[in-house]
């Protein structure tokens, strides 16, 4: 099985302050997220981490934490906080992918990057875009994308219960997009659905973001 996650931020104490993560200490967070990954991703599965595996940790300490994850095949699409995982001492931690990584799995094109894109390869032909970086929480961002016909999804752990998302779960999610629109208007929270409930949800989300 293939899995995706992003922005675990192992070792980053301040991430507890600017996200809604439910732990009191960074050690509790590290342990819980490792347990969440191991609870879903099997040893022989494949896991894509779309950036920011760790922050404020030495490469050696981050590598030691990586070894606690049972999955053997982990790909890292680099984010803005990642180490140089190609240096010899830690080169075995991940398969390091390019900043924009394009997969084709069972006919489905998937564009991976750390940063969200407004335009991605094949977006007019049903390709998915998976990303991280923005630390969206509670699923609101992903739901707004789906309601507006965008095949774009934040796989970051803050948006997904601090756990990876499987390819099958994403396939089911995107099946809920009735008519992919093939374009993005900036900013992403512009409501084009005509649905008043979506408008109320967007207004509430904007207020929340303004307060944070």
Describe the residue ranges of each PLM region:
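Short, hydrophobic/glycine-enriched beta-strand segments
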Residues: 1-7, 152-155
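Core catalytic region of metal-dependent phosphoesterases/phosphodiesterases
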Residues: 3-5, 10-104
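Intrinsically disordered, low-complexity, mixed-charge
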Residues: 211-212
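Conserved beta-sheet core of the metallophosphoesterase superfamily
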Residues: 91-198
């Amino acid at each position: 099985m293939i899995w995706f996650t992003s922005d675990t931020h192992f070792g980053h104490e301040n991430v507890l302050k600017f996200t809604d993560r439910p732990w009191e200490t960074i050690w509790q967070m590290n342990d819980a997220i490792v347990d969440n990954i191991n609870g879903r991703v099997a040893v022989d599965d494949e896991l894509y981490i779309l950036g920011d595996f760790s922050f404020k940790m030495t490469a050696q300490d981050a590598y030691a934490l990586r070894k606690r994850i049972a999955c053997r095949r982990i790909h890292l699409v680099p984010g803005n906080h990642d180490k140089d995982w190609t240096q010899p001492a830690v080169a075995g931690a991940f398969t390091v992918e390019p900043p924009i990584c394009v997969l084709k799995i069972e006919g489905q094109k998937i564009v991976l990057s750390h940063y969200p894109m407004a335009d991605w390869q094949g977006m007019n032909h049903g390709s998915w875009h998976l990303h991280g970086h923005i630390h969206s929480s509670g699923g609101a961002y992903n739901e707004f994308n789906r309601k507006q016909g965008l095949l774009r999804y934040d796989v970051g752990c803050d948006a997904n219960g601090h756990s990876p998302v499987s390819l099958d779960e994403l396939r089911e999610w995107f099946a809920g997009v009735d008519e992919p629109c093939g374009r993005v208007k900036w900013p992403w929270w512009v409501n084009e659905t005509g649905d008043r409930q979506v408008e109320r949800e967007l207004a509430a989300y904007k207020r929340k973001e303004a307060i944070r």
